[in-house]
């Protein structure tokens, strides 16, 4: 007998758990002793692509879809009431089937702790999931993709659920739905289609919240007092009536905007006082107020531009230690002066690109426009470490670095990461030599250590003697 065949049944079942369910079924027929092991495999990974072969156009054939569903029925029947830990289902069909709800009910009744379901219904928007299925004391992780959820808070019972991921889901729930998940710690809302445009996420236990690319979003209310990590990459909501995130430690805000919204953001206020587009941008200030206790903050180019409409309502970020700002030449730094002044304890500033859209409203944060009070917004900033990424070696960038050296009073270290993939002047020997000379010149007139890095490794260092 070979070594694999002599392994204990528990070990063999664990090995089978790393295979797709079809692979496990095919493997089990190789040895007489293995034939019943599929009944005790604790992890079922069922993917219809190994049956339907969509790359060959067979997924639309009715008989193949029927064969797949019959296979799932047989596997679940074979397992009977044996305990199950994980059930993953990926299924494409062109007709709604009650079987999906039956399969989910089966594994929930057997104590499944991790459930991952993707069902694509051809010719219709979403396959509806029955709330009657979702009553379980054991479910810890639930991932739902491309399905319809029309539930009320009282319809479900998931007291142990810690992770909920909703991807491309049609969501028809009331404002109490998330509150009905008492153990929830991680919530992901990705490309969700909301029935009600005014969305409320209310939960006392959530620690990590991700909201990306949602549809039909009107107002957004966040009542998440235990939230620690927040990632928001979405269209600007109409309003943020509630943003309760007192324990927030890290946040990434990446607003999705149209060029029309940017145009209106840059227009003089006097012309758009009553304009709904501008009011929507101004209301972003309420979201910023909600994240004011954050220690680590990342802002996209769009977000920084939108914040130019929130300067008067910009909160104090008293706890902020590290600020990362992404830049590109199509978006401006108008909000930079106010933002830096409102971060009194900032220690690390990371600029992912120095090039940005130049406007007179950049004021004294950069060297783009000559100002009588140049650098005034920087002199009160306590930044000790400045990290610059995507450095291309342009004269404009060099002037900006010089500006920072002259006006950040507490600056002790600058890390400059050279651009490796995009355009750069640093591959030209004459330019590279000029930059080296300028860096040495800057260093002599400051108390700052300057490092030029390539691929994260030190290329050149100028250290104060």
Curated annotation (Swiss-Prot):
Annotated Pfam families: F-box
Annotated SUPFAM superfamilies: F-box domain, RNI-like
Domain F-box as annotated: residue spans: 1-47
Superkingdom assignment: Eukaryota
LRR repeats: 97-122, 141-168, 198-224, 229-255, 296-327, 328-353
Disulfide bonds: none
Keywords from the UniProt entry: Leucine-rich repeat, Repeat
PANTHER family per the UniProt record, alphabetical: RNI-LIKE SUPERFAMILY PROTEIN (PTHR31293:SF16)
Protein's recorded name: F-box/LRR-repeat protein At1g52650
Organism: Arabidopsis thaliana
